[in-house]
From Swiss-Prot:
Record's keyword annotation contains DNA-binding: no
The name this protein goes by in its record: Adenine phosphoribosyltransferase
Gene3D superfamilies per the UniProt record, alphabetical: 3.40.50.2020
Principal location listed in the UniProt entry: cytoplasm
GO biological process terms held by the UniProt record: adenine salvage; AMP salvage; purine ribonucleoside salvage
Matching NCBIfam families: apt (TIGR01090), PRK02304.1-5 (NF002636)
UniProt family annotation: Belongs to the purine/pyrimidine phosphoribosyltransferase family.
UniProt EC number: 2.4.2.7
Record carries keyword Transferase: yes
Top-level EC class: transferase
CDD domains: PRTases_typeI
Pfam family, one: Pribosyltran
Length: 177
């Protein structure tokens, strides 16, 4: 496991001042070019999803969709998409939140998306300030379901996002920076 995590770390490229000055961007796209590394990530996440007995996978766009779609197929669980405004049709629930480098962002989810998902795991590539996750938590609760797990490839520890997650909800993070 340690060797795989080291290989994951080596695969991730770092870019200073992207997308804005002062931000260190972790580019995970090289992982998708290596099927062995990507499969390792999916196996770790799928095992966690089974451990928390989730019955649905909730993920935000865009990179969350990459993991969420693959995990939904692997675990045979429904995939619930959380998107930016005006990307989903139907009746929507929306939540405002702040990002590390942008304020007053909005996420939307179809109000019928969780009808068969009462125990949700939130999957995304990165945990930074936890603004996105907190907004998704609120949407899940508002629609009558609960978050039973958080699953991320990377945590940016200096932003203290993990401290803002629900304290009694299991968390899986593969890499910590």
């Amino acid at each position: 496991m340690k060797q795989k995590l080291q290989a994951l770390d080596r695969a991730i490229k770092r870019f200073n001042d992207f997308p804005t000055p002062g931000i260190l961007f972790y580019d995970i796209t090289p992982i998708f070019l290596n099927s062995e590394l990507f499969e390792f990530v999916l196996e770790q996440m799928a095992q966690f999803i089974q451990e928390v007995k989730a019955d649905g996978i909730v993920c935000p766009e865009a990179r969350g969709f990459i993991f969420g779609g693959a995990l939904a197929s692997k675990t045979k669980l429904p995939l619930v998409l959380v998107r930016k405004p005006h990307k989903l049709s139907g009746e929507l629930a929306r939540e405002t939140y702040d990002l590390e480098y942008r304020q007053n962002s909005i996420l939307e989810m179809r109000v019928d998306a969780l009808e068969n998902c009462k125990r949700c795991v939130i999957v995304d590539d990165l945990l930074a300030t936890a603004g996105t996750v907190a907004a998704i938590d609120k949407l899940i609760a508002r629609l009558g379901s609960q978050t039973v797990g958080y699953c991320f490839l990377i945590e940016l520890q200096k932003l203290h996002g993990k401290a803002k997650l629900q304290p009694n909800v299991a968390t899986k993070i593969l890499l910590h920076y």
